[in-house]
């Protein structure tokens, strides 16, 4: 049912007053009358579905939804009702699934040789596998796993999306990403993913949408020098100048010109993982990553050929806390990191 029809039907239940209500408009087939009624529901006086909710009622509804989401997430930590999918060993050329994490910010970190490194903190919040697509229905070469991260309110999701999550038994997610995986790395939908999916010392690729700067000129967008500031130059100082030649009589595609700066997907390749906090699911990666604070990023094993060998000793296809023989410590460090609390100087 289209959105305007659903809204008109719901409004008719409240505002229909006999022959002059929505029934007459529907019978006449005049869509304009229906739109007028729909617009009346969104007047300055407020909407008819939440105008009578008090602050106490709103807080009660939010608490009720939060408790339901926690119950759904806790049920996924229990053994599944049906048989789990088989786990295959790692093979050369295998490709694992990635994670969806929240960018918290940046902080310094020191290695044992005294060098300072700036790292970015990425927190994995309620990350689950949502859907499995076989390679026959994807691209014919690799299968695909759809992963969702960070639970959000269900009041702003459509009915079809809520039905999809209801079948999975999971609350709705804010960000959904798709990862190409090999057949031996597929994971059952509904499986939770943790920061321990990665290990300190390996290299990852982080993808996110860069910070939007709006419409900018060529000097800020591309680093052009601009025009002279003195010596008779008065008409322009920040324009690009000539953008083509007279013989060509056209502007070549791809010419650097003013336009939108930022707000596009960019990937930072080959970032080293220095530390992992298993209690709060925080990954410490080297350097900066695209995006602003509190944005959701996509993390996966690095595709750079120089770092392919680091995928041999990783949890495959992912980290399962129930099947791990010994419990992981709260913090996992790279062997080069100077751990907090360790002496800075050791006399031999």
Curated annotation (Swiss-Prot):
- GO CC term (a single one): mitochondrial inner membrane
Answer yes or no on keyword RNA-binding. no
Q: Which GO terms describe its biological process?
A: translation
Q: Which SUPFAM superfamilies match?
A: Translation proteins
MF-aspect GO terms: structural constituent of ribosome
Q: Does the keyword Ribonucleoprotein apply?
A: yes
Full protein name = Large ribosomal subunit protein uL3m
Q: What is the lineage of its organism?
A: Eukaryota, Metazoa, Chordata, Craniata, Vertebrata
């Amino acid at each position: 049912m289209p959105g305007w029809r659903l809204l008109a039907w719901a409004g008719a239940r409240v505002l229909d007053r006999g022959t002059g209500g929505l029934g007459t408009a529907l019978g006449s087939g005049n869509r304009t009358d229906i739109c007028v009624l729909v617009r009346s529901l969104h007047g300055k006086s407020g909407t008819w579905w939440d105008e009578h909710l008090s602050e106490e009622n709103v807080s009660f509804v939010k608490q009720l939804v939060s408790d339901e989401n926690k119950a759904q997430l806790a049920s996924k930590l229990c053994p599944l009702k049906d048989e789990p999918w088989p786990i295959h060993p790692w093979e050369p050329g295998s490709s694992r699934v990635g994670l969806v994490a929240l960018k918290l910010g940046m902080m310094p970190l020191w290695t044992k040789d005294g060098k300072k490194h700036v790292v970015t903190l990425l927190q994995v919040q309620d990350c689950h596998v949502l859907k499995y697509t076989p390679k026959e229905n994807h691209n014919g070469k690799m299968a695909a796993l759809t992963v969702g991260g960070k639970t959000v309110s269900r009041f702003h999701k459509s009915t079809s999306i809520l039905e999809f999550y209801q079948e999975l038994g999971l609350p709705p997610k804010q960000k959904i990403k798709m990862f190409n995986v090999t057949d031996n790395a597929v994971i059952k939908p509904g499986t939770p993913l943790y920061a321990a999916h990665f290990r300190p010392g390996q290299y990852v690729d982080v993808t996110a949408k860069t910070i939007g700067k709006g419409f900018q000129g060529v000097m800020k967008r591309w680093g052009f020098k601009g025009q002279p500031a003195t010596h008779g130059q008065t008409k322009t100082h920040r324009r690009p100048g000539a953008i083509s030649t007279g013989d060509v009589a056209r502007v070549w595609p791809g010419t650097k010109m003013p336009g939108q700066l930022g707000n596009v997907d960019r990937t930072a390749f080959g970032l080293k993982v220095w530390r992992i906090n298993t209690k709060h699911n925080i990954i410490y990666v080297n350097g900066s990553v695209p995006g602003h604070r509190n944005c959701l990023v996509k993390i996966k094993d690095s595709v750079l050929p120089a770092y392919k060998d680091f995928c041999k000793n990783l949890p495959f296809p992912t980290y399962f806390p129930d099947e791990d023989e010994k419990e992981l410590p709260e913090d996992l460090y790279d062997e080069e990191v100077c751990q907090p609390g360790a002496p800075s100087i050791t006399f031999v």
